[in-house]
């Protein structure tokens, strides 16, 4: 029965399910920094900018259930476009490269799982990135993350 609340089915990829019936996961953009070429970010400076780069800091991390395995490999949606996670997923934040999109507003919605415009990232895709199943991705979302349930 709980699967009905998430929109996940073991029979179909999420891209074949009506998007309004699926779980989504959002966060606001909290900070924006421009870093010069050669500057590093994140734990151990694992991301080094190859050019002047705009980095958005998002208030979500592994303490919220956002897997550290998404470090350097996941993406999020901002303004309907995919932007890459750069550096390691930290306890309370992730950083994404927003150099190639329009300027952002503080608090602008960032989609971690869901749809923005014509682009989408669903739990099954996130699961593929980290070698697990969609159920684990959704069950891993921590208790610090508020839930909002909408009726159909």
Give the role of each language-model region.
Residues 1-152:
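Active-site anion/phosphate-binding pocket segments in diverse small-molecule metabolic enzymes
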């Amino acid at each position: 029965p709980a699967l009905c609340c998430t929109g996940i089915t073991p029979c179909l990829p999420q891209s074949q399910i009506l998007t309004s019936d699926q779980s989504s996961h959002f966060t606001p953009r909290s900070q924006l920094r421009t870093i010069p070429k050669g500057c590093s970010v994140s734990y151990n400076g694992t991301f080094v900018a190859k050019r002047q780069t705009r980095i958005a800091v998002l208030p979500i991390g592994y303490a919220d259930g956002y897997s550290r395995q998404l470090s350097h490999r996941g993406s999020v949606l901002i303004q309907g476009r995919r932007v890459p996670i750069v550096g390691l997923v930290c306890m309370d934040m992730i950083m994404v490269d927003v150099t190639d999109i329009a300027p952002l507003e503080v608090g602008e919605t960032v989609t971690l799982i869901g749809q923005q415009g014509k682009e989408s990232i669903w739990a099954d895709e996130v699961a593929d990135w980290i070698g697990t199943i969609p159920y684990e991705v959704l069950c891993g979302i921590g208790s610090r993350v508020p839930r909002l349930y909408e009726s159909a």
